[in-house]
Amino acid sequence: MRVIAKKILRDFWKLHADSEDQLKTWYKEASKASWSNPTDIKEEYAKASILKAGRIVFNICGNKYRLVVDINYLRQWVFIRFIGTHSEYDKIDANTI
């Protein structure tokens, strides 16, 4: 998968240093993955939430942070749509952000 907007992750872990290792690990794993559907993701990330229209929510640092991505399975693209604290996540609509 090609992860688009790594800078968003990098900027976030500069502000939240405790997230750096897990975000780097997620980025590396996602970059090497060849997901073809949400089931592939659930096999690797059982706690990921599958939303509509290709959106996936990943729990980072034991659900302290939330990462929302939009996936184009055909083109193998992962777009970072949101990374934030759990309380920040509660204020957005993950389906449309």
Please place each PLM-identified region on the residue numbering.
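Basic, Lys/Arg-enriched alpha-helical interface segments
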Residues: 1-64, 72-79, 86-97
